């Protein structure tokens, strides 16, 4: 009788383990396209990612680089004070997007240009994403009073 209970307990534990591993694998598989790693411009220039890799880049829109093209096409450079990466974007920019302001873009780095599929700007006059602040502090550009 005891061995039957013990065997049943082992079966339940084994089934629970298989279910846990299976659900973890399914969650990881489902999220593979939803995870975008953040990189600063310096990191992108040091180790350029593959053209197929989607990631986020953040920093300050470099002064004097914002160029509006035909329609909704925009070109600018994003910098963290240590390096600058050219960015292209086709779409409507956020209202608070301007030079010398923080931004985060999602896209791919192809042939030396970050091709953004999404651009986010700070949402008020004092906010800057934590990743951008950390990257700017690392380069010695960020000061606490900066917005």
Swiss-Prot record:
It is a single-pass type II membrane protein. SUPFAM superfamilies: Heme chaperone CcmE (SSF82093). Its main location: membrane. Residues 31-147 are periplasmic. GO terms for biological process: cytochrome complex assembly. Heme binds at residues 123, 127. It comes from the Bacteria. GO terms for cellular component: plasma membrane. Keywords: Cell inner membrane, Cell membrane, Cytochrome c-type biogenesis, Heme, Iron, Membrane, Metal-binding, Signal-anchor, Transmembrane, Transmembrane helix. Residues 1-9 are cytoplasmic. Belongs to the CcmE/CycJ family. Heme chaperone required for the biogenesis of c-type cytochromes. Transiently binds heme delivered by CcmC and transfers the heme to apo-cytochromes in a process facilitated by CcmF and CcmH. HAMAP family: CcmE (MF_01959). This is Cytochrome c-type biogenesis protein CcmE. The gene is ccmE.
């Amino acid at each position: 009788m005891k061995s039957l209970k013990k065997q049943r307990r082992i079966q339940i534990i084994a089934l629970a383990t298989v279910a846990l591993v299976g659900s973890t694998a399914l969650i990881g598989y489902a999220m593979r396209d939803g995870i975008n790693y953040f990189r600063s411009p310096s990191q992108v220039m040091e180790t350029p990612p593959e053209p197929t890799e989607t990631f986020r880049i953040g920093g300050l829109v470099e002064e004097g680089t914002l160029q509006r093209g035909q329609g909704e096409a925009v070109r600018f450079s994003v910098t963290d004070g240590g390096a600058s990466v050219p960015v292209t974007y086709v779409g409507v920019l956020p209202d608070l997007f301007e030079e010398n302001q923080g931004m985060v873009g999602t896209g791919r780095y192809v042939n030396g240009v970050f091709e953004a599929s999404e651009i986010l700007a700070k949402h008020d006059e004092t906010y800057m994403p934590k990743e951008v602040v950390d990257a700017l502090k690392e380069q010695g550009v960020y000061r606490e009073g900066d917005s």
